[in-house]
């Protein structure tokens, strides 16, 4: 049984229902963090707790008072279920195909595997083991509201050996397409007014990663990333801080 399968959402709750109905493997707890912050989708999400599901034992809906970002809700999934041996984290606009979850669990059962990715190392679906968090830390919440939090985490094990399973091997949908990211990012696609703010934040987050790990974190830039955050050997790779001024500059307004 999957101990916890978690997601977060800002808008368009029909995607979460689609995700929920696509579950075809036993799950102890399906948790949704409502990142809307405006009380626009509260009632629709609450109804999810009343929907019977053959494979899901518990449904938890957590309405956050304001948006804490992608890395913020990823960390909440980990913290709120701290005794889990692993956490299965997924974008709200994903839909599993039959057999996907069974295959993901099979890969996760390998004790040497630290992370299982959905496809080609993607982070729209991933399984994260507890010992990986112990060694490499939580996600960097400076990367509010979204983008680069996955790439940042990947830099932490550039200079060490971490066994990952890069693809589950069974297709799944992201948005309306299967096998690619062409219709992903449904948060800003569903609410175009957010697009500009999110894209600006994305660029700011890239510059933050330049400082933290060097521009070589990007695949097209030659060189090596720093072995320690901000090229400071006194700092462990698991270090997480919170630059309030930087985060405030990217605030979405809710």
Labelled PLM ranges:
Residues 11-25:
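Short, well-formed alpha-helical segments that are part of the catalytic scaffolds
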Residues 84-95:
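Short beta-strand-to-loop acidic/aromatic patch adjacent to the donor-nucleotide binding site
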Residues 94-125:
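Conserved donor NDP-sugar-binding/catalytic core segment of glycosyltransferases
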Residues 75, 84, 98-109, 133, ...:
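Short alpha-helix within the catalytic core of nucleotide-sugar-dependent glycosyltransferases
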Residues 128-147, 156-167:
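Aromatic-glycine-rich donor-binding/catalytic loop that engages nucleotide-sugar donors
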Residues 64-81:
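Glycine-rich, basic loop-to-helix element that forms the pyrophosphate-binding segment
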Residues 151-254:
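C-terminal catalytic/acceptor-binding lobe
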Residues 24-63:
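Acidic donor-binding segment of Leloir-type glycosyltransferases
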């Amino acid at each position: 049984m999957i101990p916890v399968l978690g997601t977060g959402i800002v808008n368009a709750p029909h995607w979460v229902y689609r995700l929920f109905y696509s579950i075809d493997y036993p799950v102890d707890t399906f948790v949704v963090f409502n990142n809307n912050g405006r009380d626009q989708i509260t009632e629709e999400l609450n109804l999810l707790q009343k929907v019977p599901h053959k494979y899901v034992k518990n449904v938890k809906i957590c309405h956050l008072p304001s948006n804490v970002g992608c890395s913020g809700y990823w960390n909440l999934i980990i913290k709120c279920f701290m005794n889990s041996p692993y956490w299965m984290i997924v974008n709200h606009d994903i839909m599993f195909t039959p057999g996907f979850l069974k295959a993901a669990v099979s890969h996760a059962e390998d004790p040497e595997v630290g992370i299982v990715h959905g496809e080609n190392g993607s982070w729209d679906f991933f399984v994260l083991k507890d010992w990986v968090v112990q060694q490499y830390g939580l996600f960097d919440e400076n990367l509010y509201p979204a983008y680069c939090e996955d790439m940042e985490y990947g830099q932490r094990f550039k200079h060490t050996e971490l066994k990952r399973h890069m693809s589950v091997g069974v297709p799944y949908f992201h948005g309306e397409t299967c096998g690619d990211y062409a219709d992903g990012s449904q948060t800003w696609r569903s609410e175009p007014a957010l697009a500009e703010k999110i894209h600006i934040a994305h660029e700011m987050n890239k510059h933050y990663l330049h400082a933290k790990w060097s521009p070589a974190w990007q695949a097209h830039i030659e060189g090596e990333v720093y072995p320690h955050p901000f090229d400071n050997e006194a700092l462990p790779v698991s270090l997480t801080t919170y630059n309030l001024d930087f985060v405030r500059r990217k605030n979405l307004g809710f």
